[in-house]
Structure formats: C-alpha cells, structure tokens
UniProtKB/Swiss-Prot annotation:
This is GMP synthase [glutamine-hydrolyzing]. One of its GO terms (molecular function) is GMP synthase activity. Pathway: Purine metabolism; GMP biosynthesis; GMP from XMP (L-Gln route): step 1/1. It is an enzyme of class 6 (ligase). It comes from the Bacteria. Pfam families: GATase, GMP_synt_C, NAD_synthase. The keyword Nucleotide-binding applies. InterPro entries: Class_I_gatase-like, GATASE, GMP_synth_C, GMP_synth_GATase, GMP_synthase, GMPS_ATP_PPase_dom, NAD/GMP_synthase, Rossmann-like_a/b/a_fold. It catalyses: XMP + L-glutamine + ATP + H2O = GMP + L-glutamate + AMP + diphosphate + 2 H(+). The active site is at 81 (nucleophile), 171, 173. Catalyzes the synthesis of GMP from XMP. ATP binds at residues 225-231. Its EC number is 6.3.5.2.
Amino acid sequence: MTQDKILILDFGSQVTQLIARRVREAHVYCELHSFDMPLDEIKAFNPKGIILSGGPNSVYESDYQADTGIFDLGIPILGICYGMQFMAHHLGGEVQPGNQREFGYAQVKTIDSELTRGIQDDTPNTLDVWMSHGDKVSKLPTGFTVIGDTPSCPIAMMENAEKQFYGIQFHPEVTHTKQGRALLNRFVLDICGAQPSWTMPNYIEEAVAKIREQVGSDEVILGLSGGVDSSVAAALIHRAIGDQLTCVFVDHGLLRLNEGKMVMDMFARNLGVKVIHVDAEGQFMEKLAGVTDPEKKRKIIGAEFIEVFDAEEKKLTNAKWLAQGTIYPDVIESAGAKTKKAHAIKSHHNVGGLPENMKLKLLEPLRDLFKDEVRELGVALGLPREMVYRHPFPGPGLGVRILGEVKKEYADLLRQADDIFIQELRNTTDENGTSWYDLTSQAFAVFLPVKSVGVMGDGRTYDYVVALRAVITSDFMTAHWAELPYSLLGRVSNRIINEVKGINRVVYDVSGKPPATIEWE
C-alpha cells in the first residue's frame, strides 16, 4: 500500500519532533529531515506537502537555508515561526528583528482563510497560541495576504491561497496552542489531501512483509532487555520470521524484581520465541566491585553486556542479522550528531552498537516509529499493556540507582523496595479512577549506601535508607516532582520498612529537573 507522506524540514527547533508526532496522530506518515535535504531527494520522497519548522537562527545566516526549489514543486507548504520567515524572505518579503521578543501565550485575530476555516473553538476569528520568536515578517511577499495578527506582530499569519503557501509565527505543535492540532490537521488532511492510512494494522502488514523480504531465510539475533523497544521489536520480527529469530536475554543482576522470569514467560513460553537466558550476575558484580563513579559504572555495564552478547552471538554461527530496537528519535538524534546541526543531542542505550568484529547486518524494524507508536504496536502484537506502558528503565538498570559501589546485597534490597513502590502506585487511584502509576511519568526507588538509627519493637536498628522518586513530565527535558498523596507515601514507607529486612528509613525526593536530574546517577 502506498502511503501519502508529509515532509518536515528541520531548522533546529527544540520542538520539531512534536510536529512529526502531531502529523502521525492524524494517521498520516511523515518524516523529519535536515533543512538542507537536497532537492532531488525531496522530489524522490514525493511528499503531499512540506512543513518548514521553527529554529533559533536568523534568515540572514547563510548556513541555515533550504533549497528554494521547494517553492516550485507545486505542493502546499506550511512555514512555522522561522519557517514562515524563511518563506517570506525568499519569496520577496522582508524580515526584521522585532522590537521585543514575543514569548508565551498570545491571541491571534484571524480572518476567514483556507488554513483557519472551521478550526476556531469558542471565540470566532481568534486563536489561542504559543509564541516564541524575536524576528518577524515586516513586509509580505507578492501574492500573500495577512490572515492573522497580534498587537505586537501585525503579520502573525499569511497565505498565498493560489499556491497554497502558508506562514504562521506561532507553534501549532505545542499543547499550549489550543487549536494547534486542528490547524495541522487542516493543512495535512484538507489542504494537502493526504489520506489518513497510517495505522498500526497497516504498519504491521507492511513491516512484516519488509522484514521477510529483507531477511529472506537468514537467521536473526536480538538482544532482549525486557524494555519496551527490544520487546516490541522481538514480537514484530517473530511475527514475520518465526524461528529464524533467536533472542539473547542477558540477566546482569541489575533488573527489576522477577523481570527475568517475566521476560522468559512472555517470550519463550507464551509467544514461542527462542530465547537464550544468560545468567551473568556474578560476572557483572565482579567487574563492578569497588567502583563508585557513576560514569565508570555505566561504561563497565555497557562493555560487559557487549562482551556477554558477543560470546553468545559467536555460538550462533548461522546468524546473519543483528536486530535492534532503534526508534525514530534515535535516528533523528544520530543524524543531528553527524551533521552537528542539532541543538540538543542525547546519547541513547542500544546494544552498544555493532562491535567492530561483528560481521552482521543491521535490522531495525522500529526505526520509523515514535515511542507512543511503539507502545501502540506492542499492544497490537499482543504484548500485555502492563509491559508495553511501563515507565522508562535505564540501560545500566539498578546499577545507577544504587549510589556508589554496586553489591548484590544492595541490589536485592532495592529490588524489593522498588517493587513495593510500584505496586502501591498501580493500586492507588486519584478521584477520576486513574492509577498514580499512570499519572506519573517515571517512578522508582534509589538505594542510599548509608545507615541510620531506627527503632523496631523494643530494639534499636541500624539499617539502610531508600529514597523514592516520582516525576511528571511531557518530554523528560524538564520534570516536576509528583505530588503523591501522603497516605500513599505512608503506605509505601510502612511496607518497605516492615517487609524489606535491612531498610529502616524511607525518604521522598522533592527535587525538580532542573536543578536535579531525574535519575540520581
């Protein structure tokens, strides 16, 4: 099935990925590429329309220019913030620095136009939007009309109805812009005429066919971590090629309570996937002995994982492919790191990449999907919702939730405490019936290698401390500590102290990000 596609050219905005997510939510396939994508590649991509993202630069900086041949392709184009300024500048208009930066909430007064027709909510001819700009369009290009303004931005929206070119100075992709989703849907579905055929059933059908064509009769090996991405990748590949897939599950002794059993039950017993379970706890603990520096711990765990995985791979002499759970944000960030044009690049945990001596081809069946789409796919493939919608878990596991040196004793205590915390979050709901686990974005316990005095019964105790951490965030770049009910925190504390022998004090972390990070190490 041929998908209609939207192309997003990225000029470096912090929220460009949100544009892609909004388009995908309209069930239209889109891809995000660097602003300097060559024109012949754009033509080959054959988009139904193009969206030009925002960005931190000025249109007068020669390093941030797209090929102006896009304006001769005869397809609709929407410019957002910097994208609008780029459009105006190159089509004969003028852009000048604003007398004052406009940042935050604004109301745009609109007139009837192709772009705004039917998207206002309660107040006719008004859009509630989120602005973030300094420069602004001061003179329209020929053929354009103003379709929206604010007191400080007389040309907040513009259109050339004949050519279907549109410019908006605000960000429709962020949730603060009340009618933003409707505006993007109007552009993508109505103006571009893209068909909403990007659905999980369609994706599964296409992905299965693609994997079969790519792999043929070859065997595939996949490192199964128990995390969402590798689990969904395993389920999808197994749907496509069955016993040609072998998963390697490395238990380094730093997993959550009963996680190894859960993974084996789900994949080996329920789905019939071939899984090699490697118990490497002793090996990892030996390497981590005496190491207290967080970065050194991460590197040791990563290197040891590759070594264990590599040893298992060598036993599977018929394997020709290495499968990974790479997802679309990983692809975008890696591309940004290579071009040096992205403004915020983070590293991500995969199987550490391909070791140099590994002569395997790479299979990445999730590389076109955002995280929310991966979760949706997992449910569609029959994985339990509880597994698919679990909170993020760091690649090094409990190794970075035990402060200082990692010991088996510490990991065993932390596992039990963390499990109690998660149980209570799942079992406690707010007034709307939503569990506090679903209300929080990430929650976990942290082991502190310090002892404090306590009293239990008639005796004095001198045991360890755990800290509870729960945050609410939309993007994990910033986060607010979750204001959990005192009754919930009290229950968690009582259960941990009574049920986990060796812990006598529980504290709750009320630090936001920034200044603190979400993980303690």
